[in-house]
């Protein structure tokens, strides 16, 4: 990169989002707005010295707030009636910069490396854009009553799909806007204006993941990238033995003294419940079923699991599977493990094949080995459904 010229990144976020039916620049993806994600990639590029965010008139304050703290000087200015007006305003505002990068705020997945390559090509050649070679066969259509017909098959070897960022010497871009006049609004990108001057534009290999959010399907695609389709939680619980209480594990009653607790003290169900709540980011068992609440005194822990399954469903998850290990000298778990699996699965609304129960004796070590109580370790896998 030629470092004797400053580089400004212009983030075009002045659109109304009419095609998508939403204001794309403010849409939240994975905890951040689309605009901030797009800005983050630009300012992470070492070549970029400053950021100019172009937003709808009256929303400059919001636009600036979205890009604060990203490590580059930034300002927000008002856009115009058309994209060309907004980018022209941004280029004019980038005084003192020899190179400008223009990037769609609706492309939140561009990488800093791509921005650097486009900036370098623009500094060297005057104008450049990120683009992908066409891989599908392309047909040119002709109108016909009822449905269009194929007029010709184009040679895809000469066809590229334009992306952003697009980079320019600032003076060249402003000259292109001046020459186009009112016709600038008809151009679908800035490179078309430079091409109209007869100036060469260099193609820089783009990135397949650098797609533009234009409609609901694109929003769903972006969310599928940023929001993990599965989540995992870990649960752990212990209870000491207490005389005169029922011993319930996995919803199944065993012979012998039970465990001390506010509910039925089913340590197996409690560990599973904690794992499921943790995977959904919903805290722990004590938060939802505190031992200070008389509603849960003596209640079956299977009822708690039903409540937990409903809570995680409301949070957009379903239980994929869970695996629990009991550490206990007594009782013998293996003979009744299948019964426990069935009870737990019914409470969670899953099949027994999605629940696994196993046990260890602790080899005589610790409080488990001394026969003072039972411990349970559980892991749960949750599947995001929305």
From Swiss-Prot:
Cofactor: a divalent metal cation
Site (Positions MEP for the nucleophilic attack): 156, 212
GO terms for MF: 2-C-methyl-D-erythritol 2,4-cyclodiphosphate synthase activity; 2-C-methyl-D-erythritol 4-phosphate cytidylyltransferase activity; metal ion binding
Transmembrane segments: none
Entry-linked InterPro entries: IspD, IspD/F, IspD/TarI, ISPD_synthase_CS, MECDP_synthase, MECDP_synthase_sf, Nucleotide-diphossugar_trans
Protein residues bound to 4-CDP-2-C-methyl-D-erythritol 2-phosphate: 237-239, 262-263, 284-286, 289-293, 360-363, 367, 370
Region (2-C-methyl-D-erythritol 2,4-cyclodiphosphate synthase): 231-386
Pathway recorded for this protein: Isoprenoid biosynthesis; isopentenyl diphosphate biosynthesis via DXP pathway; isopentenyl diphosphate from 1-deoxy-D-xylulose 5-phosphate: step 2/6; Isoprenoid biosynthesis; isopentenyl diphosphate biosynthesis via DXP pathway; isopentenyl diphosphate from 1-deoxy-D-xylulose 5-phosphate: step 4/6
EC nos: 2.7.7.60, 4.6.1.12
Segments for region (2-C-methyl-D-erythritol 4-phosphate cytidylyltransferase): 1-230
Reaction catalyzed: 2-C-methyl-D-erythritol 4-phosphate + CTP + H(+) = 4-CDP-2-C-methyl-D-erythritol + diphosphate; 4-CDP-2-C-methyl-D-erythritol 2-phosphate = 2-C-methyl-D-erythritol 2,4-cyclic diphosphate + CMP
Ranges in coiled-coil conformation: none
Positions with a binding annotation for a divalent metal cation: 237, 239, 270
One GO BP annotation of this record: isopentenyl diphosphate biosynthetic process, methylerythritol 4-phosphate pathway
Family classification: In the N-terminal section; belongs to the IspD/TarI cytidylyltransferase family. IspD subfamily. In the C-terminal section; belongs to the IspF family.
Functional summary from the UniProt entry: Bifunctional enzyme that catalyzes the formation of 4-diphosphocytidyl-2-C-methyl-D-erythritol from CTP and 2-C-methyl-D-erythritol 4-phosphate (MEP) (IspD), and catalyzes the conversion of 4-diphosphocytidyl-2-C-methyl-D-erythritol 2-phosphate (CDP-ME2P) to 2-C-methyl-D-erythritol 2,4-cyclodiphosphate (ME-CPP) with a corresponding release of cytidine 5-monophosphate (CMP) (IspF).
Name recorded for this polypeptide: Bifunctional enzyme IspD/IspF
Species lineage: Bacteria, Pseudomonadati, Myxococcota, Myxococcia, Myxococcales
Gene: ispDF
